[in-house]
């Protein structure tokens, strides 16, 4: 795609003045930036493309946006962060982000950014510094004395405690990878994404400073990735981390909104509301196995409209038992799940009915980009993050993720 042949996304004129209630109950639109809208003809979505689509997003009635990770990363999905204080050059510049944030504020749109606290990239300076120290010999000074080698030392380097390192690979696990000749580090999601040690107060302080930075830049809050993996199998510790982070964010900006991803059962994910977090994604309603799709597909008394109404009441009662400020965050699908159109059999009536159920629920519903036009995508993750279709001319069209299989979009004109 050449820049000359790739025009800007269409300009949707939004002509209605809205009296937006300034609270944290919003209708959110999730944007996977890489695939959303290309503004410069390189085939990759970018922040300027998101800005060009604000009229379209607002015209649908959304007053909140969740951006997938936008920080520098070697991966297309950007969940392996190399620098928490910058914008990935594929997506533009910090000036582009500030412009997007300013446009959102002008329109009364709350802008959330994805914050990955569970792990970083192995190319992050913290990990690179720690790795270099672990490959070095001790400087010879005692731990309570100044380092004689500029903190490049296995005894004095503070960044070693930012991650999980061990001398012997734990038995019965495949989430540990070798570094050097005799050390191992933990990386649950992939070798390139080492786990951060959130039991270390210094790491928590780092993320408080990171939150401060982005709130100052114009973000209205955060979507927290992989919360249940902060301490896998230890929800109490996860909740404790969230509680500290929430107290900090609300002190800095009382209007800050935070939603967490806790991919668990209803009983388990609702417990996280005791942390003081604003919202936790409602997986009980999501995907093919969720209450919305089952109700629309209508099989059995347990999936009747009456049963759905009872489920909504149950959700609100459960949330209220943990927090009087809890806001439900229901959704049908996101970048990790099969597209809504597919789980509803590509039936236009069912797709619209499912959206109707979602948007009548209490709380802050989240809609994945492209679901409003019936985009398809299932199987491997890349397929679920396919290019947004703007028009028949290919305006703003991206290439989509590497290794994405061809998608048949049945509702595209």
Describe the predicted segments one by one.
Residues 215, 220, 226, 260-262, ...:
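Aromatic- and acid-rich polysaccharide-binding/catalytic face
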Residues 128-189, 291-320, 385-413:
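Core domains of carbohydrate- and sulfate-ester-processing enzymes
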Residues 12-16, 207-210, 267-268, 308-319:
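Alpha-helical scaffolding within the catalytic cores
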Residues 101-104, 319-322, 357-361:
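A short acidic-Thr-Gly-centered motif at the start of a beta-strand
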Residues 58, 215-216, 319-324:
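Acidic (Asp/Glu)-rich catalytic clusters
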Residues 24, 252, 257, 264, ...:
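Loop/helix patches that line or flank the sugar-binding groove of alpha-linked glycan CAZymes
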Residues 1-3, 7-198, 202-205, 216, ...:
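Acidic/aromatic-lined carbohydrate-recognition and catalytic surfaces
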Residues 192, 226-231, 323-346:
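Active-site clefts of carbohydrate-active enzymes
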């Amino acid at each position: 795609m050449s820049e000359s042949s790739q025009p800007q996304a269409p300009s949707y004129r939004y002509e209605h003045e809205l009296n937006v209630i300034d609270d944290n109950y919003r209708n959110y639109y999730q944007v996977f930036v890489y695939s959303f809208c290309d503004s410069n003809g390189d085939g990759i979505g970018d922040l300027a493309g998101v800005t060009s689509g604000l009229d379209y997003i607002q015209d649908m009635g959304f007053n909140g946006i969740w951006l997938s990770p936008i920080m520098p990363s070697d991966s297309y999905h950007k969940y392996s962060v190399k620098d928490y204080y910058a914008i990935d050059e594929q997506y533009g510049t910090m000036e582009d982000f500030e412009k997007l944030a300013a446009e959102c504020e002008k329109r009364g749109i709350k802008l959330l950014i994805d914050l990955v606290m569970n792990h970083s990239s192995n190319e992050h300076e913290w990990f690179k510094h720690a790795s270099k120290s672990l490959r070095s010999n001790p400087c010879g000074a005692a731990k309570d004395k100044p380092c004689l080698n500029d903190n490049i030392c296995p005894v004095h380097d503070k960044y070693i405690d930012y991650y999980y390192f061990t001398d012997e690979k734990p038995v019965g696990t495949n989430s540990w990878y070798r570094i050097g000749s005799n050390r191992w580090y933990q990386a649950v999601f992939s070798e390139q994404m080492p786990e951060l040690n959130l039991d270390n107060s210094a790491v928590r302080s780092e993320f408080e400073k990171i939150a401060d930075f982005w709130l100052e830049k114009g973000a209205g809050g955060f979507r927290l990735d992989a919360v249940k993996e902060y301490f896998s199998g230890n929800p109490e510790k996860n909740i404790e981390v969230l509680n500290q982070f929430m107290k900090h964010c609300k002190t800095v900006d009382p209007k800050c909104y935070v939603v967490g991803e806790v991919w668990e059962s209803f009983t388990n994910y609702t417990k996280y509301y005791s942390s003081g977090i604003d919202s936790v994604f409602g997986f009980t309603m999501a995907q093919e196995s969720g209450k919305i799709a089952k109700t629309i597909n209508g099989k059995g008394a347990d999936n009747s409209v009456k049963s759905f109404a009872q489920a909504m009441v149950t959700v609100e009662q459960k949330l209220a038992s943990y927090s009087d400020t809890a806001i439900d965050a229901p959704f049908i699908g996101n970048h990790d799940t099969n597209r809504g159109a597919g789980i509803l059999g590509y039936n236009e009536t069912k797709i619209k009915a499912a959206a109707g159920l979602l948007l009548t629920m209490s709380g802050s519903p989240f809609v994945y980009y492209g679901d409003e036009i019936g985009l398809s995508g299932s199987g491997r993750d890349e397929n679920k993050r396919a290019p947004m279709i703007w028009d028949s001319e290919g305006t703003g069209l991206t290439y989509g993720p590497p290794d994405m299989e061809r998608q048949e979009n049945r509702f595209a004109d």
